[in-house]
Amino acid sequence: MTDAIWNQGYTQNRELSWLEFNARVLAEAEDETVPLLERFKFLAIFTSNLDEFFMIRVGSLTDMAALEPNRRDTKSGLTAEEQLSRIYAAVEPLYARRDAAFRDVDARLAQEDLCRTSMDELDSSERKYIKRYFNTMIAPVLSPQVVDSHHPFPHLEGKVLHIAVLLSHKKNERLGLIPVPASLPPITFLPNDKRRYLMTEDILLAFADSIFEMYDVLEKTVFCVTRNADVPLDDEPFGSEQVDLRKKMERMLRQRRRMAIVRVELSRPVSSHFKECLHKRFEVTDEQIFLSRSAPLRMSYAFSLGDYLSDGRRSRLSDPPFIPQQPAMLPAGQSLLKTALQRDVLLSYPYESMEPFLQMIREAANDPPVLSVRITIYRLASKAKLVEYLCAAAENGKDVTVLIELRARFDEQNNIDWSERLEEAGCKIIYGFEDYKVHSKICLITRRERGGVRYITQVGTGNYNEKTARQYTDVSLVTSSESIGMDAAQFFNNMAMSNLNGRYNRLLVAPTSLKNNILSLMDGEIAKGSDGYILLKFNSLTDIDMIEKLHEASCAGVTVEMIIRGICCAPPASHPPPADRPDRKSVV
């Protein structure tokens, strides 16, 4: 049915669907009912999301266009080249929307005494201050370069701001480059005035003429390149005894820094001549160069800008602070570990705190009857109490096994570092499978009791990340069910033995049983016809079999509702939806 389903409009391209998701993030920044500082943060999130999209998805399609030009996407029938063309066309207006939203937010912040200022707006004393600041704090850490036969074009690190300057000397043109050091703060406030600030790259632009004082400066712009980050692991066998996956990942991260450029962003319009010069140097096409006319190319400072306001004003311009509550099923001060031995506990993040789970691991680390703790880890906070408690458990003589997924996108280095810390403490570290990422969120505590052992199992939908548990909606079940515990024990044994085809009584485990069982449950609702009901909540929906089954259910009269955060390859229907399409809701 795959060909027919896209020809009939029942599926859509995943990349274009992702851009629609990010457009919804941008819409939050455009919404005047959203507090001003939150709007600015949404602009920064939109920008960061788009960076990762180009690094991974556009990077992957660029490779595919070169290696498999005739291969067509199963959900839209488009080749990689056709997908890239549509992506570039869809992204261009998003830049314009971001610029407009930034101009509005920036103007409103100025009214709240947070004013982004240009060099042209400074008086003479302020100019003198910025010149001293440049000479003492910025110039000493700069590494400018003029590209010529003796100074070849350097490697440009991705997502790092640079200044490009078109220079002239004795009728010969040269390209000058100034990397913006990461050690410099993104913004600088004027002296005795915590209301007006300049962007560091704007200061560098202003002093580019003095940096290249031997040349005439013809044009200049801030730019940033985005590199393909979709790097496959090398050809060494994944399970080779001679090769530690951690070492392979470290090599992959080094390789990622030198991959092809897939996007160039400019901060101001440049002449066609200068643009052509950049084309040749970066080896990109015209449609891969994007212009940000108003918004800074990097906006991470949005998350700390409010710190310069008074407490009262910052509160007025921000969402009310969200504080997760004590779980309703667990009275304050009560041990989750001991409670779970008596009854199941369901935690709902972020509405309820993750702290009881963390304290359960801490308690297990110091509980004499606890024999072992086993857990899967995909993403962790940069400062993780969970790691501290797992290390304590190992140091206290518990058998601690951690299955840590080193290939969690853009968390690779973080996970490498944590795996080393856990291993040093005596934890047994395993990495998973060659062709699959381990995305399960499961923890098993084994406890010796009179007459045998008891299991306490936690199964959840969200990462063991103390930061994102305050932001993302997830559920976490903690149970002492013997059958679930036995399944969990078998799961960890299978992971340690690289056995994907384990058999389980209660747990549904991808890729062998999760999808088939969900499709079977949906068949049961299809058999009920108009009395059937299906409610699904996803991060993303891209699976063709699932989309076809949802289409089948809708055609059978089943009421189908979906709540989807990100990509949805089943296109939106009108509301109420026609009989052959499920109803979907998108959340940000």
Name each region found by the language model.
Residues 1-534, 552-556, 568-588:
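N-terminal localization/anchoring segments of enzymes in phospholipid and broader phosphate metabolism
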Residues 559-563:
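Hydrophobic alpha/beta core scaffold segments
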Residues 544:
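Active-site glycine- and acidic-residue-rich loops that bind
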Residues 539:
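Cofactor-pocket helix-loop regions in the catalytic cores of large enzyme subunits
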